[in-house]
Amino acid sequence: MADLCVEDGELVLHLHGMEKAEGFHGDIRVPLSSVSAVRVVEDPWAELRGIRAPGTGLPDVIAVGTRRGAFGKDFAAVHGKGPAVVVELHGTEYARLVVTADNAGAVASSLRGATGLS
């Protein structure tokens, strides 16, 4: 499962194993200064918007890859059901990152602390 962490002043979305192939993408790195909000959601599927292009998807099972629409682009790394972290960005290739995490609350809290968001 993908991991969100902070390394050298950047937010990094580490994709593991097959996720890189499923999402047609490598790790994503953005400056911490580009993070405008971090929140936890119970239903990551409700957060997905636009069409998947490119990526892999099967409703309620997996959504990994770029999502495109009038809003621009989001990147999703969603597996199964359960909590996720939604990171809203500005001035980067992606408008949002949507990532499932068993410990979504702790991940979001850590990211908020690193970015100075409350």
Model-derived regions, located:
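Conserved beta-hairpin
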Residues: 1-32, 36-39
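Acidic, Ser/Thr- and proline-rich intrinsically disordered linker/docking segments
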Residues: 23-29, 36-118
